[in-house]
């Protein structure tokens, strides 16, 4: 029986994880659930899964949850940053699902890694921001990090066993890998007229053709910044050079990514677009468990098509690839800027096409400094956010 902590329990990845747990109750126990402010959802899942601990990042939300939880459940409600870091490091915890969206997820994810836990990594921003520090922490602690993002999970499954055991320090060339092919659907605006993008609304941007996701990641998919962040994540997870990474647009989201080998072989992982599949794979690796997902029906799939990315349509993707080449400081700045600009778009403060423009401004103009520890990373993250907020104010 594995004791699990689910960070971001009230989000879409949290919900999918709890669904997989419910399919396999004899193997997994929810030890703790962690959320930010969503008391109603947390109350619902606490009653359903009865964790030992429910942690709310927001203190007022924690108090509200404590008042509403039935007393007979005997669930301890906690709050506070130190309490969260202690929770993921607790000796009773085996596995941590790291699914807090954005930079907010970095401290708790890194704490779980430093504690040597089995970390199911759905928070791509942790690697985008901390990169080498994250990999070094993983190697020093002996933590097992397994990629939950469908693309990185697909790549992981297509690699050799030796490479799977060397996450963060893979020798792709030695393993015969020529290229990692990172697939992406192109989002809801793949075929829209370029001139129409300026008027796209948040609701339109959040209508992904294949996946059901939260609003921030849905906008990132529409700009393809999500693929750019995944490009950076793949660079660190698989120790890949920019020459070894390629982005391929695959509108059907059936092939989740591919690995091309020196001998001409291409291995691909296919499946229905449902996050329960990679979650179940990570939870049970190297075994396999039920995910609750319907098997892929090849007779209904139809045509599979592939396109080269158009950087005029997706300037955020180009920015992310360039930032990856520049290094850790640039990717930290870009990630922070993007979180602010996407939220501004969702709040109706800027236009869809302003996201890339503001991100580029921040990347070009935020002063950087060496990143030697997590405090350095968070300081640069804050600096980039402040610059971006000012840029948005000037725009309006």
Curated annotation (Swiss-Prot):
1-deoxy-D-xylulose 5-phosphate binds at residues 124, 150-151, 185, 208, 221, 226-227, 230. Pfam families: DXP_redisom_C, DXP_reductoisom, DXPR_C. It is an enzyme of class 1 (oxidoreductase). One of its GO terms (molecular function) is NADPH binding. It comes from the Bacteria. Mn(2+) binds at residues 149, 151, 230. Pathway: Isoprenoid biosynthesis; isopentenyl diphosphate biosynthesis via DXP pathway; isopentenyl diphosphate from 1-deoxy-D-xylulose 5-phosphate: step 1/6. NADPH binds at residues 10-13, 38, 123, 125, 214. Keywords: Isoprene biosynthesis, Manganese, Metal-binding, NADP, Oxidoreductase. InterPro entries: DXP_reductoisomerase, DXP_reductoisomerase_C, DXP_reductoisomerase_N, DXPR_C, DXPR_C_sf, NAD(P)-bd_dom_sf. This is 1-deoxy-D-xylulose 5-phosphate reductoisomerase. It comes from Shewanella pealeana (strain ATCC 700345 / ANG-SQ1). The gene is dxr.
